[in-house]
């Protein structure tokens, strides 16, 4: 079926960069864009009126943990002060002898909820970090039926963590677990890659440099080459990892990966915040950014997650100036790429002390072209003939946004994912008039709330001090209930 989108401001790609075509048209057929321009005279089967709206490429969200909503409340202000804002350690690490937090009791609810929100907020391609470890066939079915373009496979590592009763963090090494996890991921990719009309693709996900042995990382690199897939690893993501690698190998995490021969164009470095020269690392010597740029590896920047902790890249502009390809990810909730673009820009301006830095052009490119480059796809993140028909129609004619001079600036400065009315993936409309097609969102939210409340009730079972949820993360104001 041939579909024509007409009348909006089209963010078109001219083979070099994005440009705006006012009152333009986009034509797509069989999941591919066939025409972008000012007028189209051939017959079409369907017309979508985008008059006075913004039509842009779907966002490529390169780092997502979709099931993490219930745990987000324990990752930010209640973090352990002696762990330098290493947020995931405060919630995901249990006390000795305890089971891991059951935040995946029913991934079909929490995971589905997270992915739905990401899609509604404009993510048409999602890198699901570690997806598929639990009930892999059901997970792939759930992702595939949502109609999103996804890169996924179970993550793996050699290490498990636990806390002593004193709060001391302990690493427990298990080389066999890492080897087994890698093989499970390889088998997963071989089984599921290319399913759902090619929407499901694979990627290897070793967890962190401090939780994977050099041998496991080398085997991961070799497996990726044999499979022809990319790799993403959380790297330079927190100071625990940074100092652990520095003490163990005398290198930064980036130097460690570089010297292993791990870095390359197929590799995405998740977060990649704590580098030489960063104010938190107190290590001015060395040039991690040059190593990344020279290797061709990409960075998945998740600005909101770090802004919550008072941390930022130093800086987005410096990474670009060094030649590093930067993409954007949401990491955890609220999974809104428009918000991530805004935070990326504002955080950069604060770090640089320069209101002209962190341009909206650059952060929009990171959410589209940067993401496409990171996953090795020159048919995504752009609207041009030959590209996949992944696009968004965004309503900027709202009092919350006001008069629109530049639609991209208006979107990033004043808009949000809630302004996205239509999401088209592979030529199919997945979100229409702001509603996810074929899904009762209210019922899903109700089930997710019930699941989250069960998780919160069990927090004391794995917290190293046995604290309840409200003790770990106190309410903003005291709660009073009727007796």
Task: Kindly give the residue locations of the regions a language model identified.
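N-terminal metal-binding scaffold of metallo-dependent hydrolase/deaminase domains
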Residues: 1-42, 53-55, 474-479
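Divalent metal-coordination and catalytic microenvironments
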Residues: 8, 26, 31, 52, ...
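Active-site gating loops and adjacent loop-to-helix segments of metal-dependent hydrolytic enzymes
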Residues: 72-107, 159-176, 239-267, 279, ...
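Alpha-helical scaffold segments that flank or form the walls of functional sites
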Residues: 74-149, 181-197, 449-454
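Metal-coordinating catalytic core of metallo-dependent amide/deamination hydrolases
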Residues: 140-278
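His/Asp/Glu-enriched, well-ordered alpha-helical/loop segment
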Residues: 259-266, 314-398, 413-416
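C-terminal cap of metal-dependent C-N hydrolases
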Residues: 388-445
